[in-house]
Amino acid sequence: MSLNIETTQGLERRVAITVPTEIVSKAVREEFKRAAKNVRVDGFRKGHVPAHIIEQRFGASIRQDVLNDLLPRHFFDAVIAEKINIAGRPTFAIETFEEGKDLVFTATFEVYPEVKLQGLENIKVEKPTVEITEADIDKMIDVLRKQQATWAESQDVVKADDRVTIDFVGSVDGEEFEGGKATDFVLFMGQGRMIPGFEEGIVGHKAGEQFDIDVTFPAEYHAENLKGKAAKFAITLKKIENMVLPELTDEFVAKFGPNTKSVADLRAEIRKNMERELKNALVSRVKQQVINGLIEQNPIDVPASAVEEEINVLRNQAAQRFGGNAQQTAQLPRELFEAEATRRVQVGLLFSEVIKSNELKADEERAKAMIADIASAYEQPAEVVEYYSKNEELMNNIRNVVLEEQAVDAVLAKAQVTEKVSSFDEIMNPQA
C-alpha cells in the first residue's frame, strides 16, 4: 500500500491510498466463498449455487461489501502508521476499482491542530477572597422566612414588598394593544416582573383607587410593535396585602430538617451550605478566567466536524430542557450554538495539552474529597459515597472534573494571579 498526503485547506487533509490488486482480489474471492455458503436461490440447495449465478445475482453487492470493508480498514491503517490525529469521519472517493487492477481511492478528512501552549505567564486571573459574615446568614434566613410568609389584607398605601391585585388596560397612542389587558392580576411588588415604571407607579396608592401610569417600553422589548413606545396603563387597584413573616422560633426552624432543632442549628446548616455554594462559585469564576486567558494567548483553529458534533450535543441538551422531540431538535438553528460549540472544542484541546504537557493524572484523594463534598448535601451522605464508589461511570466523571481542576491549578502556577476581597453577594449574585 502506498500513501500520499495532501493538505487542502486549514485542517482539511486528503490522502490518496493505493491497495494492491492481490489484496483486493483475495478479499473478493473470500467474500464470494462466504456468499456461496450462505446465499439462497430457488432451485438450488444452500451452499450449492453455481458460481456464475452468484456472480449474476449478487456480484455487485458482494464487491460493494468488499469495498465497504477495504476503504475504512486501509484508511485507518494508513493514518495510524503515519500517526495522524484525525477528527470526525472521512469521506471516500473511488478512483479505480476494477478486476485485475489496484484499488485507488482518496479520503478527505480533518485533523486536530497541533497545540503548543504559550503565553501562560501573560494570563491575568483575579482570585476573590470571601468571608461569609453573620449578616450574610441573616439575609439567607430572611429569604427562608419570605418563602414561608403569609399575606394579610391591608388598607395602607402600597409599599415595595406588598402583593397587590389589579385590573389594567394598556394603550399606545390611545389604542389598546394585544397582551396589554388583565383582570384580577396578582403582582408581587419589588420583583421587577413588569416593565420599568409600572410597579413604581402603583407604590403609594390605596385599594379602590383608579389611576393611570405612564411608562416607556424598553428598546429591547420582545414585541416589535412596542419597542421604545410610550404607553399608558389604566389601573384599578383592588386589593393590597402585606407580607407577614414567620417568627424565628424552634418550631419554624424544625421545618428545615430533622437535625435542625434550634436557631443555632439552622444558622450552622446555612453557613455550611453557603460555604459549599461559595466554593463552587469561586472555582467556576477562576476557571472561566483561566479558560479565557488560554484562548486569548493560544488562538487555534478547530475542526469543523468536531464543532458540528458539539453543536448536536448542545442542540439535544436544549431540546431536553424545553421538552422538545427529535424533529424539533433538528429545527433549532445551528447558529444558536456555533459560538459555544467552537469554544468548547477549543477548551477541550487546550486543557488536553495542559494535562499532557504537565503529565497530570487524576488525584484519587482529591476525587474522594469531591465525592464527600457532594454527599454532604444529602441526609445520608455515607450512602451517597458508597453509590459513587460502586458506579465506575460516575467515578470517571468525578476524575475528569478533578483532572480539569488540576489543569487549572497548573495554569495558575504560571499565570499572574491577584487576590481581591469580595462579598458573598458579589460572587453569588454578580448581575445584581
From Swiss-Prot:
Q: Which gene encodes it?
A: tig
Kindly state a single biological-process term from the GO annotations of this entry.
protein transport
Query: Transmembrane ranges?
Result: none
Which Pfam family is one of those matched by this entry? Trigger_N
Q: Which InterPro entries match?
A: PPIase_dom_sf, PPIase_FKBP_dom, Trig_fac, Trigger_fac_C, Trigger_fac_C_sf, Trigger_fac_ribosome-bd_bac, Trigger_fac_ribosome-bd_sf, Trigger_fact/SurA_dom_sf
**Coiled coil segments of this chain:** none
Q: Cite the PPIase FKBP-type domain residue spans from the record.
A: 161-246
Name of the protein described by the UniProt record: Trigger factor
